[in-house]
Amino acid sequence: PLFLCILLSACDLIDYHPYDGRLTISERDINGHNIPLIEAATKDKDTIRFVLMGDTQRSYDETEDFVKHINTKKDSIDFIIHGGDYTEFGMKKEYEWAVDILSKLDIPYVGLIGNHDVIGNGDQVFNKLFGRENFSFIVRDVKFVCLNTNAIEYDYSHPVPDFGFLKEELQDSTRHYSRTIVAMHARPGSEQFDNNVKDVFQ
């Protein structure tokens, strides 16, 4: 009986499957939550300042140091864009560790999906934590169009990047903006990008 009790008390220590998508942290739709904060905080500013970071997988100590450092600069930075690769293998636990660290930021951030984040069912975990893989937002008169460009991880079986989404965003006239920044993890010409379509980005 004692042995059985010990086993039962240790059940929470068992990871049933590395690609179990059931999250144990409360964060959901991080981008959907933070984008309105970014837009509201910058609406009266003449100049916007943002930090681009990424590829933080397995670099938990360094990411913690980054968060501590960037929090000392919070009065001079409006928001952060994480360019993806929170994980090495797309595992739920990796996502949770990364998001737990990033949740300590005093500055709102948005997250793109990286090629490592797609592995297994990592894209599904990303969708739960951050929202859609393709999204946009406007800061002052600058539109940020954020794309999933990690074609190789889908074996080119999905339309990645989604040119339908990109076209709609670039033709959108419902809100005023004068400049556009297209943000992505895998750049045109990289091995993760579908280079059959890279000329579109020239």
What are the functions of these language-model segments?
Residues 1-11:
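Sec-dependent bacterial lipoprotein signal peptides
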Residues 11-97:
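N-terminal active-site segment of His-dependent metallophosphoesterases
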Residues 58-62, 88-94, 116-121, 152-155, ...:
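Active-site environment of divalent metal-dependent phosphoester hydrolases
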